[in-house]
Amino acid sequence: MKIGVFVPIGNNGWLISTTAPQYMPTFELNKAIVQKAEHYHFDFALSMIKLRGFGGKTEFWDHNLESFTLMAGLAAVTSRIQIYATAATLTLPPAIVARMASTIDSISGGRFGVNLVTGWQKPEYDQMGIWPGDEYFSRRYDYLTEYVQVLRDLWGTGKSDFKGDYFTMNDCRVSPQPSTPMKVICAGQSDAGMAFSAQHADFNFCFGKGVNTPAAFAPTAARMKDAAEKTGRDVGSYVLFMVIADETDEAARAKWEHYKAGADEDALSWLTEQSQKDTRSGADTNVRQMADPTSAVNINMGTLVGSYASVAKMLDEVASVPGAEGVLLTFDDFLQGVETFGERIQPLMECRSHIPAVTREVA
């Protein structure tokens, strides 16, 4: 099973809490995280894009770096780990993304790929005057289908004359082209999102579900597997989890309860309000899960809380789910979390037994 790190491009990572670690996103922080991840044989690093945060006492995600420029910098200071940036497709023409991706492919020596997102939080785009109207919610995957076709044309042949409802290319050129086939990833959980990923993505991200229920996402992976089979393609699921680990189950649980007790209610109210704007995509979208009050303090990603051995066992259970090809991990404390994972958790995982033992890196 592949292991990735979801780097904290926004302040405070993925814990919407006054009692969680408070920090700003910087290049130096993300450089240290990704270099540690590479040292411990993580397979990939991904950054999201967020253009407006949730406010509240913690100013959650009000402070964010930009994904492509961050990952270009990280590509230059790593040598093995795969690097993925996220394109907010309403803000960037596909020909520009194609050229930026080709540039980072050159920087990384063929280790780069692109995560495509349609956009769900209206204020991110309204603040710039580029929100296309609420009808966009129902046609966003039509838009993204044309977008990815332009990308594939330009990466594949260096030229596009695509004509569609949203994009018109007139002998559009991009050169040099990527040195290796460019990976495209998505995070669809609605029926429309999964149908898009089945047709166009190399793999699909989905949320884990619940606390210490590592296989609860299995129905989502099964839906993705079924959708891919209809297209004759193999599109695996990569599952998002937060790891909160300690020497004992009790110590890890105490951390988790401490973070929940400090939940930033004002920021969570903003998330809930925004999640209700899309009335056209169904009840199974990522953003609806994010806002579920069950575990909104970490946007309801799957959460693995326990001793190092307990977390290792739960990750092996994830690996046993049909269609699950990888996990994307976040941590309450990223620098310590990546190191602890590499030294204390990964060596106990059967699905990572092929990874050589690694000692702590020398500063």
UniProtKB/Swiss-Prot annotation:
Catalytic activity from the UniProt record: uracil + FMNH2 + NADH + O2 = (Z)-3-ureidoacrylate + FMN + NAD(+) + H2O + H(+); thymine + FMNH2 + NADH + O2 = (Z)-2-methylureidoacrylate + FMN + NAD(+) + H2O + H(+)
Q: What positions does the entry give for FMN binding?
A: I49, K50, N115, E124, R140, Y141, S190
Which cysteines are cross-linked by disulfides?
none
Give its E.C. classification number: 1.14.99.46
Query: Quick check: keyword DNA-binding in the entry?
Result: no
Domain of life according to the entry: Bacteria
Q: Name one GO biological process term.
A: nitrogen utilization
- Record-linked Gene3D superfamilies: Luciferase-like domain
Report the PANTHER family cross-referenced here: ALKANESULFONATE MONOOXYGENASE, ALKANESULFONATE MONOOXYGENASE-RELATED
HAMAP family assigned to the protein according to its UniProt record, in alphabetical order: RutA
Q: Which NCBIfam families does the annotation name?
A: RutA
Family membership:
Belongs to the NtaA/SnaA/DszA monooxygenase family. RutA subfamily.
Identification of the protein by name: Pyrimidine monooxygenase RutA
Lineage of origin: Bacteria, Pseudomonadati, Pseudomonadota, Gammaproteobacteria, Enterobacterales
Gene name tied to this protein:
rutA
